């Protein structure tokens, strides 16, 4: 019978991980020593015997590489055990299988029997006094429900233990073929040194070893190791993102910490409101670097960030991207799109007059921070927002500001946001809220609001940005291929035609692409493709396979191809 003790398992896994890391360090040193002998210069060590010895140690380098791969697999497996226990909600559990399968089963049967006997005895008593005082026997339904629920929990716990045990053993077995290969491969290396008294490195036959059947399997083993390590790396990254997103959702009060976490998570993995808040923090930091900011302005910027990023659904981003849900959350009935736009426009105009025209430094900076962030998030979308932190963009602003004697002149807001459209925001004065053409920014917000009546549906052909949450824009591969193969082609960036897909449909296309990438590069993630070697036929077939995986209808495909083939060319 199994006994599951989480503390002991985690403690032993941690101990073994440290031992493997120490062993890995020793293997790296051993590999370095082997390589030093294998790379000896002919001027110091030459001749047929010397060549055999150097080849012998050169092949030992390959063996140590195999050991290092195996050790890495062991380390990532042991390091992932705590996450598996956490997912199973068994991080601090102590469970004896015999207790679940015997003691609790007996207790369940005995409890049912006792209750049945008590109910029967009570019924006999009530029958005896029925002519004097008729009473109904008590119901045992609640007891039965709770007893059944407890037994169901017992069975699920047994299943959970068995599944966890089986999953861990199955994954651990992933390394067995590596171990068997290393043992057989090393044995063949030793045999290739000769027999009897002649079994020395000086008689080593590199050809016999390298052309052996077992050594020819080295490529398959290396591919297996790389695939396993890649999957585990992706799992660890997904878990890190999940934990960081939870931290953001729980609340991070420090803007710098919020921005740091947002960048680690990746803007493409954040909710629209989180992206918007991160964008605005970037904006505030860059404005701070471009000129003097008073304390009133800093406070206003902080409140402006809060107005957009707070948990309640009141931000303009939420209002425009999902007006129905927003109004519902605020306790209002969903209204007609035209009336929705009129209402938003009136609110923008009112806030502009109150906070910009008739406001002070605090209210103006608050209004500008909110407005710029709202427009920026709408234009850049979630994936492009990370480009805001480019050093060259911030540098251009700072340099221009310093050349003007710390007066901001001839500086454009688009310099701060490299992928923005041309806002034509005027720049003059020496504090952020004064360098913005507020009237034009107000119009930008209203223009943004006007898009609220357009609903994007799956398989619609749309621009790559902005995103259309909860749908995802499938960028495809034709744009990157065309940049390398079509003369004078220039990518349209955020305006590149894409197909709107559900998350499940988009994941299906990614799976097809990763399989193709693996065939091309041996890697499902991070492989570098030589796009010039990819033929038009191959890119067309890949595109169609991705569309097939997402069940994109023929009409939508044709619309996508028509839109994509309207190339932009360099002059």
Swiss-Prot record:
Residues 5-39, 141-192 form a coiled coil. It holds the Pfam family LXG. InterPro entries: Bact_secretion_toxin, LXG_dom, Tox-SHH_dom. The keyword ATP-binding does not apply. It comes from the Bacteria. GO terms for cellular component: extracellular region. One of its GO terms (molecular function) is toxin activity. It comes from Bacillus subtilis (strain 168). Probably interacts with cognate immunity protein YokJ but not with non-cognate immunity proteins. The interaction inhibits the toxic activity of YokJ. It is found in: Secreted. This is Toxin YokI. Disruption phenotype: Deletion of the yokI-yokJ operon has no visible growth phenotype, however it is out-competed by wild-type cells. In the N-terminal section; belongs to the LXG family. Signal peptide: none annotated. Keywords: Coiled coil, Hydrolase, Nuclease, Secreted, Toxin. Toxic component of one of 6 LXG toxin-immunity modules in this strain. They promote kin selection, mediate competition in biofilms, and drive spatial segregation of different strains, indicating that LXG toxins may help avoid warfare between strains in biofilms. Mediates intercellular competition during biofilm formation; disruption of the operon disadvantages the bacteria, but overexpression of the cognate immunity protein restores growth in competition with wild-type. Residues 1-235 form the LXG domain. PANTHER family: RIBONUCLEASE YQCG-RELATED, TYPE VII SECRETION SYSTEM PROTEIN ESSD. Induction: Expressed on rich and minimal solid media likely in early stationary phase; not dependent on DegSU. Not expressed in liquid LB, but only under conditions that promote biofilm formation.
